[in-house]
Amino acid sequence: MSIKSDRWIEKMALEHGMISPFQAGQVRENQNGRIISYGVSSYGYDVRCSNEFKIFTNINSAIVDPKAFDENSFVDVQSDVCIIPPNSFALARTVEYFRIPRNILTICLGKSTYARCGIIVNVTPLEPEWEGHVTLEFSNTTTLPAKIYAYEGVAQMLFLEANEVCAVSYRDRNGKYQGQTGVTLPRT
């Protein structure tokens, strides 16, 4: 496998709709001043989260069960910032919609700005021919509330080209998260 460069990422985004909306170069400021950067980088793409958040709460004393997840365990918030309680987590989605080519596997890593504050971003790989908005999971590992900024960079996508094309893609097997557009809860 080889990692793909900024030139390849830009070409695939502009000519094949791999990332939409797409930002060429890094954006580090907006009308309000400095922000956490997003856009294409040397060997990746820094994504933004939207202003749709689901903040985990255990007001119902539920057991966290991925096979039978209780939607009432979340509070929906629409805001330019999300405050995650101590030792808790929140879900969000990317602003960007992805269409992953059949010969590409995409890995997501959290941005160091958040990691250095004890905020971990977790996303599973984007498989060949998967498409949709990426559901992001933010874990607050600290004993204090933590802030996430909507419309700013939160994670970096790395694009890896396979040595050969897979026999069965995510689309071929009708993956359960194919085409997701909102913050998507666990499915079985």
Swiss-Prot record:
GO terms for molecular function: dCTP deaminase activity; nucleotide binding. DCTP binds at residues 111-116, 135-137, 156, 170, 180. Keywords: Hydrolase, Nucleotide metabolism, Nucleotide-binding. The active site is at residue 137. It catalyses: dCTP + H2O + H(+) = dUTP + NH4(+). One of its GO terms (biological process) is dUMP biosynthetic process. InterPro entries: dCTP_deaminase (IPR011962), dUTPase-like_sf (IPR036157), dUTPase_trimeric (IPR033704). Homotrimer. Catalyzes the deamination of dCTP to dUTP. This is dCTP deaminase. It comes from Legionella pneumophila subsp. pneumophila (strain Philadelphia 1 / ATCC 33152 / DSM 7513).
